[in-house]
């Protein structure tokens, strides 16, 4: 039944529709740090809710594909999507100064870790040696969190591989969601630009070990194993 009582004022509705960061900056400019802090905290959770919804949606969709069409369709699905989205990004990344990508990848993982909020929050460290930067996620903000949150458990859990594939890092019972990394990070970039864009190693034990990505200062130093696991050789 309709009501004549308003739930919010026009100003309140206007504020709800503004970017939270803009409101936080405005609060700082107005000398209101408490409101700015509150808005910054709210913004972390705004992104996490959307992030987790999309991650679980992707996990559910690829699980459905494997269940209904078979595991060979998993490869076809990832390839189809990446050709239409990720390929152009890989080519752009390869064109940028490699030092700049370290900062961009760190920003990506800050976002993907959803600012460390929510249950089993994402977290990562970065280290540097003479040849590369190592990003260690423990847990990563999506695939590993799904496992630690129990999203693969029970009758309605997400799917895992029934067989070992090169795109499941030679492992059976491997989380289907995480197989996208084989295609996005290694297999398809090798086909597009000649080398893996983000050579990576998934956790051995998802409950304990990190997921590790590498960014080499010179792509020529990327170890051959990141080709060989797919039956390929560096060129």
Residue ranges, per PLM feature:
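N-terminal accessory segment detector
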Residues: 1-210, 217-235
């Amino acid at each position: 039944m309709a009501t004549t009582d308003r739930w919010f004022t026009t100003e309140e509705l206007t504020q709800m529709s503004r970017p939270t960061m803009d409101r936080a900056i405005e609060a700082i400019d107005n000398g209101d740090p408490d409101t700015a802090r509150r808005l910054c905290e709210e913004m972390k959770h705004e992104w996490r809710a959307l992030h987790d919804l999309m991650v679980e949606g992707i996990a559910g969709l690829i699980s459905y594909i494997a269940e209904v069409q078979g595991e060979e369709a998993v490869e076809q699905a990832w390839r189809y999507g990446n050709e239409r989205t990720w390929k152009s990004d890989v080519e752009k990344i390869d064109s940028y100064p490699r030092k700049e990508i370290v900062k961009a990848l760190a920003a990506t993982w800050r976002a993907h870790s959803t600012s460390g909020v929510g249950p089993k929050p994402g977290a990562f460290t970065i280290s540097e040696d003479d040849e590369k930067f190592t990003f260690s996620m423990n847990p990563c903000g999506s695939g590993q969190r799904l496992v630690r949150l129990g999203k693969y458990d029970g009758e309605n859990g997400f799917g895992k591989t029934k067989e070992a594939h090169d795109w499941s890092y030679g492992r059976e019972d491997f989380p289907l969601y995480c197989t996208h990394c084989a295609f996005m990070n290694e297999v398809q970039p090798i086909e597009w630009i000649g080398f893996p864009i983000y050579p990576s190693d998934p956790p051995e034990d998802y409950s304990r070990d990190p997921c590790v990505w590498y960014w080499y200062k010179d792509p020529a130093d990327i170890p051959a194993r990141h080709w060989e696991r797919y039956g390929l050789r560096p060129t």
